[in-house]
């Protein structure tokens, strides 16, 4: 009789992980963590001094996860403090303020700082990164749109979420996906799962969208010199049209970039005899 009874499923073994937050001062790193861990929002800004440390427990599938969170100060003054905390990290919460373009532009510098501190033997490919486009509740002041932020994140194989520490929007979903990805990382021998490491578009497509977005005029948008001939304009247009056509390119912002290229070509050809 006992031999035919269903076996009780053994609970998954516990797991300890290290998570750090990165990003400029005042982007809301601490507020995001407090919103998730303490279910509250602190409206008064209190700058993080050096490092804030906290521990929380979560459950992913059948495993208990003990999360050690190191909330790192974003001010350059605290570099000598935070540079000791990059190593042995499984997950990074990379935060910028959608109303502060400089905080978005600084993301590359934060990655460079981490890479430098990990040294030649450090491998950032085996760390789960989640990008939080924070303060989306401040719609009037937004200057970094979703497609721009998502393009940057996904081109690097990072997770991307739109969040508001004030309202709580996107916070729980972000952390749940983040922790699941870290558990998958640990269960995959410390290697980032393929689904999280490869973008569904090319670097050439991502670079073209960024260039078009930041171009100063129609000539610059098509990548031709002012005064270019009709044939040169059409040749440049065809190359970009093939690269970015919405039917073949799924990169965030590709549809807007394609429309901008079409409009740029039309505007230039009107003035070329």
UniProtKB/Swiss-Prot annotation:
InterPro entries assigned to the protein according to its UniProt record, in alphabetical order: DnaJ_domain, J_dom_sf, P-loop_NTPase, Small_GTP-bd, Small_GTPase
Predominant place of localization: nucleus
Listed Pfam families: DnaJ, Ras
GO molecular function, one term: GTPase activity
A GO term from the CC aspect: nucleus
Region of interest (Required for interaction with MAPK1), ranges: 1-18
Single biological process term from Gene Ontology: intracellular protein transport
Keywords: GTP-binding, Nucleotide-binding, Nucleus, Oncogene
Tissue: Overexpressed in gastrointestinal cancers; expression correlates with later tumor-node-metastasis stages of colorectal cancers.
Domain J span(s) in chain numbering: 217-273
Compartment(s) where it occurs, according to its Swiss-Prot or TrEMBL record: Nucleus
KW Glycoprotein (keyword) present: no
Binding, GTP: 23-30, 71-75, 134-137
Extra information: DNAJC27/RBJ knockdown in several colorectal cancer cell lines is correlated to inhibition of MEK/ERK activation, cell proliferation, colony formation and in vivo tumor growth.
Family per similarity comment: Belongs to the small GTPase superfamily. Rab family.
Function: GTPase which can activate the MEK/ERK pathway and induce cell transformation when overexpressed. May act as a nuclear scaffold for MAPK1, probably by association with MAPK1 nuclear export signal leading to enhanced ERK1/ERK2 signaling.
Subunit structure comment from the entry: Interacts directly with MAPK1 (wild-type and kinase-deficient forms). Interacts directly (in GTP-bound form) with MAP2K1 (wild-type and kinase-deficient forms).
Protein's name in the database: DnaJ homolog subfamily C member 27
Protein species of origin: Homo sapiens (Human)
